[in-house]
Amino acid sequence: NETPAEDYRLAAKLGAVINLDDLTHVDFLERAIGYIPKKIGCRFNPGGTFSLGETREGFQVMDKPGDAKYGMTRAQIAEAFRLLKAKGAEEFGIHAFLASNTLSNEYYPALARMLFRLAAELQQETGCYITFIDLSGGVGIPYRPG
């Protein structure tokens, strides 16, 4: 994801919470807006496949985070949090988007368990104050023939 500098500048001007997809975006964001926001998020990608079994339609549109070009590995997000904290960030969030067309009632509880566990680990490991978890989208719609 190559977010243009002007998009980061607009987000900062609007007071939006910025989520970074890649460790290299930390320095790029700082150059683009001149500082690191006090509140910031990072996108986590656990890799592998995220599946809760077949949907009623027999598929999920996207459920292979390991193939996605977005998000940071466990090691990268820990490094990003440390770097962001050193550059002035005070509140941190974790975002993840692991599957699309999820019709199972189990998706969000499973995703929440994963992200809250990660948040607790990262807070202990990095000393960063994690104030929000973004469970993303991915809610499926009932595709039907005709």
PLM region spans:
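Active-site-proximal beta-alpha core segment in soluble small-molecule metabolic enzymes
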Residues: 1-132
